[in-house]
C-alpha cells in the first residue's frame, strides 16, 4: 500500500518506519521545535510534522510505544487515535504522563506508532429482537475479576 505524505516541519526527521521486519507499527517522531516538559499527570499535544493521504478504505491507528509506557509512564490519552482516509491535516499525538516524574520530550524522539488497518463500513438494520447468546447482556466484570 502506498501512502502519500507531506513533510510540514519535519524535514530533518526520519520518515515513519518499521523497526523490525515483523513490526506492525511504524514509529512516529516528535516534531517539536524545542524540548517540551511533560509534568507528571499532564497532557500535551505533540506534532509529528507529517500530513498523509491514506488510501480510501483504510485508516491509520495511532498507538503508544510500550517502552515509553513501561519505563516512564508516557502513553497516549486516546488510544488508538484514528486518522481517517479523508483527513489531510498534520498528525498530532495526545500524550499524557502517567509516571511519577516529569518527562522531557526532545525533537526526533519516537513518540508513538502508527498501524494501518482496513475499514469496513457498517449498515445498521433495526430489528425487534436480537439472537440469544450464552453471554447475553453480561457486561463489565461479568466473568469475574
From Swiss-Prot:
It comes from the Bacteria. It catalyses: dUTP + H2O = dUMP + diphosphate + H(+). GO terms for molecular function: dUTP diphosphatase activity; magnesium ion binding. Its EC number is 3.6.1.23. Pathway: Pyrimidine metabolism; dUMP biosynthesis; dUMP from dCTP (dUTP route): step 2/2. Substrate binds at residues 65-67, 78, 82-84, 92. One of its GO terms (biological process) is dUTP catabolic process. InterPro entries: dUTPase (IPR008181), dUTPase-like (IPR029054), dUTPase-like_sf (IPR036157), dUTPase_trimeric (IPR033704). It is an enzyme of class 3 (hydrolase). Its cofactor is Mg(2+). Keywords: Hydrolase, Magnesium, Metal-binding, Nucleotide metabolism. Belongs to the dUTPase family. This enzyme is involved in nucleotide metabolism: it produces dUMP, the immediate precursor of thymidine nucleotides and it decreases the intracellular concentration of dUTP so that uracil cannot be incorporated into DNA. This is Deoxyuridine 5'-triphosphate nucleotidohydrolase.
Amino acid at each position: 500500500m502506498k501512502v502519500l505524505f507531506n513533510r510540514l516541519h519535519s524535514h530533518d526527521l526520519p520518515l515513519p518506519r518499521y523497526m523490525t521486519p515483523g513490526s506492525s507499527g511504524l514509529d512516529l517522531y516528535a516534531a517539536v521545535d524545542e524540548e517540551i516538559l511533560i509534568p507528571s499527570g499532564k497532557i500535551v499535544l505533540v506534532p509529528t510534522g507529517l500530513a498523509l493521504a491514506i488510501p480510501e478504505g483504510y485508516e491509520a491507528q495511532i498507538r503508544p510505544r510500550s517502552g515509553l509506557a513501561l519505563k516512564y509512564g508516557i502513553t497516549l490519552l486516546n488510544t488508538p487515535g484514528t486518522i481517517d482516509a479523508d483527513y489531510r491535516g498534520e498528525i498530532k499525538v495526545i500524550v499524557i504522563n502517567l509516571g511519577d516524574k516529569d518527562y522531557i520530550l526532545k525533537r526526533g524522539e519516537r513518540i508513538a506508532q502508527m498501524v494501518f488497518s482496513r475499514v469496513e463500513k457498517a449498515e445498521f438494520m433495526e430489528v425487534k429482537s436480537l439472537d440469544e447468546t450464552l453471554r447475553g447482556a453480561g457486561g463489565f466484570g461479568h466473568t469475574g475479576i
